[in-house]
């Protein structure tokens, strides 16, 4: 079996010249307005308005417009964030289909309605605060069929105060539910449910975990002596930032390489109906479960041969950071891809899953060799 591993003897980062080749993607800071309102006990309506004078195609992935049970809003009670019970998907960002976009004309608005009780534990009821913030990637030109990303728009909603009826909230079914574990056994890696795998899928996942461990460990070792690159991806070189990055990457490396046990359970296939079009893999952070989707195997190489491209190894690394047993608090999807991730603030970047995946993927010197096991 072929595996890709970081050259541990070098443990260095390549020059940042490759970043110059990435097209500049302007942030339209005020192009999108998002207003939240309540339409029921836990039902939320988000009104998204294009404030500009050009039509926009808004990419739905990991935004307030996402059709999956993702983290569309933040919910707080008594100053503490309410437990999120939905899914955190990683989407394929190449060859985007028009169906992944919402078309919005100049000054036009679109509404999105969702029940936060389906993705949050609101069984206690009481007063809560709901807000939304994030980035929407935009495509311009060629009308409603535009799919080439040309920019991105940041948004921050109003704060919505609600008094939740606990009984009504408890009656709402959870979007993802609980997974009944029936783990198979293998000789190596974090808990893989082998009953969910074909031999080919198992081989691919074991290879991805091996590479995830190698990349994460090499990146952890390289970070303290490569502060310019740390600043590029995480916007800070403070000792606390570097220590957090190192600790989290080491945790990912450990979880990816545990023998016979681990804190997460990894499924080769989807048993929770989360693999909607465009989803490579997804995590249920409250249960520490990861699921691969069909296009993880069909559309991704084992490890990309150029910077910042998606692959199986860094998709697995990305998903590992979503698990609370690996990274606490678990990382979110605040910025996707190089341009978006490197435009985040320091506070956002340290909690962004793709920042770790890109840091590990984009700058490490790799070596391809034959290896039959870890």
Swiss-Prot record:
Residues where Zn(2+) binds: 318, 322, 333
Annotated signal peptide: 1-19
Disulfide topology: 197-268, 275-293
GO biological process: proteolysis
GO cellular component, one term: extracellular region
InterPro entries: Fungal_M35_metalloproteases (IPR050414), MetalloPept_cat_dom_sf (IPR024079), Peptidase_M35 (IPR001384)
Propeptide regions on this chain: 20-189
Major localisation: secreted
Catalytic activity line of the entry: Preferential cleavage of bonds with hydrophobic residues in P1'. Also 3-Asn-|-Gln-4 and 8-Gly-|-Ser-9 bonds in insulin B chain
Record has Zinc as a keyword: yes
Cofactor(s) needed by this chain: Zn(2+)
Entry-linked Gene3D superfamilies: 2.60.40.2970, Collagenase (Catalytic Domain)
Function of the protein: Probable secreted metalloprotease that shows high activities on basic nuclear substrates such as histone and protamine. May be involved in virulence.
Protein name according to UniProt: Probable neutral protease 2 homolog ARB_00849
Organism: Arthroderma benhamiae (strain ATCC MYA-4681 / CBS 112371) (Trichophyton mentagrophytes)
């Amino acid at each position: 079996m072929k595996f890709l591993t970081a050259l541990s003897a070098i443990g260095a980062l390549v020059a940042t010249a490759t970043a110059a080749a990435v097209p500049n993607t302007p942030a339209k800071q005020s192009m999108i307005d998002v207003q939240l309102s309540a339409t029921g006990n836990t039902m939320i309506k988000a009104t998204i308005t294009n404030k500009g004078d050009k039509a926009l195609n808004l990419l739905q992935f990991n935004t307030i417009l996402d059709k999956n049970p993702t983290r569309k809003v933040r919910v707080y009670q008594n100053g503490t964030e309410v437990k999120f019970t939905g899914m955190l998907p990683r989407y394929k960002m190449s060859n985007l289909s028009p169906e992944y976009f919402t078309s919005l004309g100049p000054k036009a608005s679109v509404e999105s309605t969702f029940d936060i009780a389906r993705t949050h534990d609101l069984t206690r009821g009481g007063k809560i605060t709901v807000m939304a913030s994030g980035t929407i990637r935009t495509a311009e030109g060629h009308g409603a069929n535009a799919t080439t990303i040309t920019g991105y728009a940041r948004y921050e909603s109003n704060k919505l105060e609600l008094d939740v009826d606990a009984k009504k909230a408890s009656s709402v079914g959870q979007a993802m539910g609980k997974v009944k574990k029936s783990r198979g056994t293998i000789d190596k890696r974090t808990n893989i449910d082998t009953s969910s795998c074909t031999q080919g899928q198992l081989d691919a996942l074991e290879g991805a975990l091996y590479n995830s461990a190698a990349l994460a460990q090499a990146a952890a070792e390289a970070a303290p002596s490569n502060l310019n690159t740390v600043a590029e991806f995480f916007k800070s070189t403070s000792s606390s930032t570097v220590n957090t990055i190192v600790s989290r990457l080491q945790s990912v490396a450990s979880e990816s390489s545990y023998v016979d046990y681990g804190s997460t359970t990894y499924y080769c296939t989807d048993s929770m109906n989360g693999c909607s079009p465009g989803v490579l893999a997804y995590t249920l952070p409250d249960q520490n479960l990861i699921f691969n989707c069909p296009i993880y195997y069909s559309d991704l190489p084992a490890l990309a041969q150029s910077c910042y491209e998606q692959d199986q190894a860094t998709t697995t690394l990305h998903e590992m950071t979503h698990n609370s047993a690996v990274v606490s608090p678990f990382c979110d999807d605040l910025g996707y891809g190089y341009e978006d991730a490197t435009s985040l603030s320091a506070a956002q970047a340290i909690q962004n899953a793709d920042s770790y995946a890109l840091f590990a993927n984009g700058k490490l010197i790799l070596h391809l060799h034959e290896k039959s096991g870890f």
